[in-house]
Amino acid sequence: MQESHAVLVVEFTGPSVSDGTLCTDRLAPSLLALSDALRFLNRLVNPDGVEAGLSVTKAEGGRFELGLWVWRTFENQIACLADGVVDPVPCPAGLLADCLVEILALKKWLEGGTDAAFAFNPAIGGFEVTAGDRRLAVSGGAWIGFRDDECGAACSRVAASLSTPGVDAVLCLSQNRAFELAASGRAAFERSLFVRQLTDAVMTFTVLVDSAGMLEGRRIRVSLGEHHSFTAVMKDD
């Protein structure tokens, strides 16, 4: 029920890859980081009860074809059946794969700079990133993942295997997005962790509160489920 599938291609190039002397375990840190980033991104863009994961479908030299799956847990399926409503997964596998690759491409584009700014643009339904005289449009899913500490840090580790002698570059492809990073750009890529948000747009959300607890100073800690919560401050009108 509500299972979707996409393909991610990750390919490492360089003399050690070409001549077959590179051990696959030297590429494992980047591949595992990609899996971590996917897991964190899925928690941000999909509700509780929707899981995501990778599996290796083909491996040849430095090229890996990865199956990306998004599915509802058994408990979530039963809850949906009991409610009589099965809503579409907000971010299915294909879109999730595109968002993940888009985050990697954004980190490369920023070149390690910290003076860039995000602004929400309703006309494109996403965000515009400005760095000096350069501009880039990114999706809302990519913006959410990039801004998250855990997802952003995991994406930075995708470049880890480029520190291996004889590995010159890594390429990552989804159906609609592409990312390629040379070893010479690794340091700047890993520095791109945070940028400012500049936007006057007001975004309205309707949320279902799971539970709430009082904190000090008229603050309320509101839980929206296992992975999502926020702090609100009560004020007199």
Language-model region placement:
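Long, positively charged binding patches that form subdomain-scale interaction surfaces
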Residues: G132-D236
